[in-house]
A protein has these predicted regions:
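Bacterial N-terminal signal peptides
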Residues: 11-21
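Residue-level detector of bioactive/disordered segments in secreted/extracellular proteins
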Residues: 3, 24-25, 223
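Cell-envelope/glycan interface and biosynthesis
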Residues: 49-271
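Short Lys/Arg-enriched alpha/beta "domain-start" segment
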Residues: 34-55
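Bacterial N-terminal signal peptides that target proteins for export
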Residues: 2-13
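Bacterial Sec-dependent signal peptides at the C-terminal "C-region" and cleavage site
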Residues: 21-33
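Low-complexity, Gly/Ser/Thr/Pro-rich intrinsically disordered linker/tail segments
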Residues: 263, 276-278, 283-335
Length: 335
């Protein structure tokens, strides 16, 4: 888990800084199948964070159709197509004008994106909580091909990979690594609750695994893959229920709870425009990238701009929540 192995991520950061732009498939941590030279700094960080987060990934392979991840069992998942790599990076995910953003928000099916696009929006670890304008929901964009390859494409397959742990004495079913991460979260919070009993009512599990669609959508919920847990929904609402453009709890929700989850690879739905304040989702690749970028910034750089071939790409820059501020702010959350 990230919170328990800081040296692991420090080593990853050092390796990123030393990794040359022209690395080949054979030299970049076992990637094979063709040249991976010329990738942006962000793509290199994404691929390294994916491999560090998921031991099921055996290799990264490139070919005329794009870049693929090869998983155990010879399964392959597309990281990014050749067309996506050749176009302005992440055009399909975030760099959209106001009308396009609104159309995308009203078409949630299009939030099933490539792995590359799913990792682009920067997730900011607590205590930092940026504004969440329309279009800013880091981690709510998902690659369902990747989730199905990791956990199963149907309920029966996912169930076979479930384990059971507990949070504050309540049993929770989650998938493999997520169940181990939740057990570590429970360990972190046990002492916090002992010292601050007022936290306990916020930590009532409303369930982990449940094969179902997202409320109001046709996409599968991450609960379907056993990687999400909801806590105390009566206290921490979902945007469709609250019908508020922004919710005060997005800023005031207890940081000790959020930090305990983030330290073990979970992201919090309170950092989304379409906020889900009860929702914690196991996405270790996103938290790994968040910590790498934070280390780059605190080391004296400015995130991706501190790496060779960094943020500026084909006339565009890496999006940040601050870049998106004010976009669509007048729209209500009715999608």
């Amino acid at each position: 888990c990230m919170g328990r192995h800081p040296s692991r991520w420090g080593g990853l950061l050092l390796w990123l800084l030393l990794l040359p732009l022209c690395c080949t498939a054979e030299t970049a941590a076992g990637e094979r199948g063709g040249e991976l030279s010329g990738l942006s700094a962000e793509d290199r960080i994404n691929l390294l964070c994916l491999r560090s987060a998921y031991p099921q990934i055996r290799a990264v392979e490139s070919g005329p159709d794009g870049i693929w991840l090869r998983l155990e069992g010879e399964r392959r998942v597309l990281y990014a197509s050749a067309a996506e790599l050749a176009a302005h990076p992440y055009d399909d995910a975030t760099l959209l004008d106001r009308e396009q953003r609104l159309a995308r928000r009203l078409d949630p099916a299009r939030m099933d994106v490539s792995l590359r696009a799913s990792m682009h929006l920067p997730y900011l670890p607590d205590p930092e909580r940026a504004a969440t304008p329309l279009g800013y929901s880091p981690g709510r964009w998902r690659s369902y091909a990747f989730l199905k390859a990791l956990y199963g494409a149907d309920a029966a397959t996912v169930r076979r990979g479930l384990g059971v742990t507990s949070l504050q004495g309540r049993k929770v079913r989650m998938s493999g690594a997520a169940v181990r991460a939740l057990a570590a979260v429970d360990g972190r919070l046990r002492e916090a609750v002992r010292q601050r009993p007022e936290l306990k009512p916020w930590l009532v599990s409303a369930g982990g695994f449940l094969w179902r669609p997202i409320a109001g959508e046709q996409r599968l919920s991450p609960h379907s893959f056993g990687i999400a847990i909801d806590l105390s929904p009566q206290r921490a609402p979902y945007w469709r229920w609250a019908r508020m453009e922004r919710h005060p709890l997005q800023q005031s929700y207890d940081s000790e709870i959020v930090r305990a989850f983030e330290a073990e690879g979970f992201i919090w739905g309170g950092k989304w425009h379409e906020y889900d304040l009860m929702h914690f989702e196991y996405r270790p690749e996103i938290m790994a990238k968040a910590r790498v970028l934070h280390q780059l910034e605190t080391a004296g750089g400015s995130g991706l701009e501190g790496l060779p071939g960094g943020a500026e790409r084909d006339g565009g820059t890496v999006a940040s929540p601050h870049d998106l501020s004010g976009v669509g702010a007048a729209e209500g959350s009715n999608g």
